Amino acid sequence: MPREDRATWKSNYFLKIIQLLDDFPKCFIVGADNVGSKQMQTIRLSLRGKAVVLMGKNTMMRKAIRGHLENNPALERLLPHIRGNVGFVFTKEDLTEVRDLLLANKVPAAARAGAIAPCEVTVPAQNTGLGPEKTSFFQALGITTKISRGTIEILSDVQLIKPGDKVGASEATLLNMLNMLNISPFSYGLIIQQVYDNGSVYSPEVLDITEDALHKRFLKGVRNIASVCLQIGYPTLASIPHTIINGYKRVLAVTVETDYTFPLAEKVKAYLADPTAFAVAAPVAAATEQKSAAPAAKEEAPKEDSEESDEDMGFGLFD
């Protein structure tokens, strides 16, 4: 009987993961190290209506995906990433929005000896409030301290742990003592390892790329292409406008140095022959605009006078 129950559970699990893979075009492969059942329940509640979390044994997930490759060959790209303590977060919503919800559900945690540090830990310079008997912990970690008013004071900021480092016993003990100072260096939650989007698998860092960043990179690429094409004389859509402008400038330069001319070059020649004429023409044009604006102002002034005369027809406030 237990075997039948286990077999039924496996069968239902296979059907569930296949159904989710068919229904949801996008999903995250997430790491679940140090995530407890209570925190997982909180994450599921926060994602309700937007995403579905599915955990399970790696062998079962791989077997279910391999059995479904005939219907969706693109799922094979997921197989190399199913290793370690991982699960799936399926969604139809915006991936960035779901990612932000997962990040919001991280919880601070104390350091444990033997754990892998998920982030850098720096102990700031401060008075720890700890008694002199705890000095040995700081000495073992190479942290410079002094005794100030009967308590240990850290003299300078110290980088205690780097990302990926294994937390030692001394580091864990010190950090747990510093928890009394509201220093909770680690936070745990579902960590996005890979993103699956309609058959494509990519790193979660891609989600940080905004439209503005893409636009800037595109423009930079266009400028680089135009520059290279101009240098080698190869015409492209990016370089042709610059080629035409540069050619026009060269033609103008030739007309200036020779007797050859054309209508568009006449103005350039006139400017070079007498630059002061153009300097005088600009103030004259500005003065003409001011004169044309003055009559309009004069026409508005009599209207205001007539309105004032109408108001003063002879009746006082108390007549």
From Swiss-Prot:
Region annotation Disordered: where it falls in the sequence: 289-319
The protein's name: Large ribosomal subunit protein uL10
Taxonomy, superkingdom: Eukaryota
GO biological process terms on file: chordate embryonic development; cytoplasmic translation; ribosome biogenesis
Keyword ATP-binding: no
Keywords attached to this entry: Cytoplasm, Nucleus, Phosphoprotein, Ribonucleoprotein, Ribosomal protein
GO-annotated cellular components: cytosolic large ribosomal subunit; nucleus
Record-stated family: Belongs to the universal ribosomal protein uL10 family.
Protein task: Ribosomal protein P0 is the functional equivalent of E.coli protein L10.
Major location category of this protein: nucleus
Cystine connections: none
SUPFAM superfamilies, sorted: Ribosomal protein L10-like
Pfam families cross-referenced by the UniProt entry: Ribosomal_60s, Ribosomal_L10, RL10P_insert
Gene3D superfamilies: 3.30.70.1730, 3.90.105.20
Localization, UniProt: Nucleus; Cytoplasm
One annotated GO molecular function: structural constituent of ribosome
Modified how: Phosphorylated.
CDD domains in UniProt: Ribosomal_P0_L10e (cd05795)
Alphabetized InterPro entries for the sequence: Ribosomal_protein_uL10 (IPR050323), Ribosomal_uL10 (IPR001790), Ribosomal_uL10-like_insert (IPR040637), Ribosomal_uL10-like_insert_sf (IPR043164), Ribosomal_uL10-like_sf (IPR043141), uL10_eukaryotes (IPR030670)
Quaternary structure, from the entry: P0 forms a pentameric complex by interaction with dimers of P1 and P2.
